[in-house]
């Protein structure tokens, strides 16, 4: 009985925050909160010997109060998000100390521009950090790191298949000759940027080819996405679509669909080809149609444990950010994004004083029992990105800054 009462209370709380009028979100208050939490994290990272700028905040488990940090290595795909958070916080606060910290953490990732590609995550690692750093400072050294890393990422492109290989390490163990995951759509932005900022024009062609093949093979007829598409390297044909982090091969994993929404919005921005805008709308529609009332998805839309399954705040943050950009191309999406941000900015999803992260209730890798109902750094990154995008739109600026 006690569990039932608690469960009803939580569900009621989720419903209440969904009814906030979309125009009432105080974006400056939410950004002030992010600034406070960023300062808390920096204070936590500081030891008697100073800050180790190679150690990046990754997650805080539900029963913990402090960040678990991981070394910035080629294997740590999340290492670029904390520097990105700092750059976004600097953009809002104009705090020179935050800028200095952003520079130091960002510099820890320079090595990625000088080594062969470990996997496709170079966009997450370098464009979230160096990309934002260059946008705000125009430091030419940052630009060169981005250009060099984009060239490295392109070495994973297979012209027979037409996509970038996501996980070379999984080719033999899983018998996935050429595997491409939906997350890879996010890395295309770095290729587009490099191609128009002095890099090899071929990078544009790689990004477009990847987007086209993914659009053709990575989605079911209802526009829900597989997490992984496995291709034949001889024929280039699709072998199968499977999951890796979702509930099952046939289900809609929330963050995977979020990557698709964000990714195709970017592809339309960079190409202005209406087929990508149409596709972005379609993959968005199937996501929005199945959301719970507070607009924060269950980690997988088809988990049979719903409504008791965990939510994924990270997916909501990614989609909110994407929808704010998409709303500048289509006459809808902004209100839904504000509803998502209103929920994420409520006491049910913000960490508040309990932890130095921005958000609670994200899911990393359910099948591996990893980062379940946790605070995760990429949720914070896309949350502050979305808040800044909303602030810019309200102030009559371009959504990207």
What are these language model-derived features?
Residues 1-25:
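Bacterial Sec-dependent N-terminal signal peptides
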Residues 20-401:
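Glycan-recognition and catalytic cores of secretory/periplasmic carbohydrate-active enzymes
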């Amino acid at each position: 009985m006690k569990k039932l009462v608690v469960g009803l209370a939580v569900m009621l709380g989720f419903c209440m925050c969904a009814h906030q009028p979309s125009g009432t979100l105080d974006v400056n208050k939410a950004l002030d909160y992010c600034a406070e939490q960023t300062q808390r994290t920096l204070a936590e990272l500081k030891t008697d010997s100073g800050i180790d700028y190679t150690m990046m905040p990754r997650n805080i488990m539900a029963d913990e109060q402090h960040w678990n940090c991981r070394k910035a290595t080629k294997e740590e795909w999340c290492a670029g998000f904390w520097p990105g958070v700092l750059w976004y916080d600097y953009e809002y606060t104009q705090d020179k100390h935050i800028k200095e910290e952003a520079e130091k953490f960002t510099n820890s990732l320079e090595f990625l521009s000088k080594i062969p590609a470990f996997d496709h995550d170079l966009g997450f690692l370098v464009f979230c950090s160096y990309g934002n750093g260059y946008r705000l400072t125009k430091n030419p050294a940052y630009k060169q790191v981005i250009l060099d890393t984009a060239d490295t990422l392109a070495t994973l492109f297979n012209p027979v298949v037409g996509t970038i290989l996501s996980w070379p390490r999984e080719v033999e163990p899983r018998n996935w000759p050429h595997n491409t995951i939906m997350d890879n759509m996010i890395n295309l932005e770095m290729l587009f940027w490099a191609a128009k900022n002095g890099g090899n024009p071929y990078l544009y062609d790689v990004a477009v080819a990847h987007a086209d093949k993914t659009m053709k093979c990575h989605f079911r007829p209802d526009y829900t996405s597989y997490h992984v598409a496995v291709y034949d390297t001889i024929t280039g044909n699709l072998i199968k679509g499977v999951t890796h982090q979702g509930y099952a091969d046939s289900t809609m994993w929330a963050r995977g669909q979020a990557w698709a929404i964000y990714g195709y919005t970017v592809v339309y921005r960079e190409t202005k080809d209406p087929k990508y805008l149409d596709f972005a709308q379609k993959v968005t529609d199937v996501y929005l149609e199945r959301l719970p009332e507070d607009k924060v998805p269950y980690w997988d839309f088809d988990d049979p444990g719903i409504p008791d399954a965990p939510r994924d705040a990270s997916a909501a943050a990614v989609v909110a950010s994407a929808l704010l950009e998409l709303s500048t191309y289509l006459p809808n999406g902004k209100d839904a994004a504000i509803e998502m941000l209103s929920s994420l900015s409520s006491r049910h999803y913000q960490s508040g004083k309990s932890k130095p992260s921005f958000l609670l209730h994200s899911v990393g890798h359910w099948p591996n029992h990893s980062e379940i109902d946790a605070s995760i750094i990429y949720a914070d990154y896309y949350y502050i990105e979305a808040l800044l995008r909303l602030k810019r739109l309200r102030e009559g600026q371009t959504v990207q800054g």
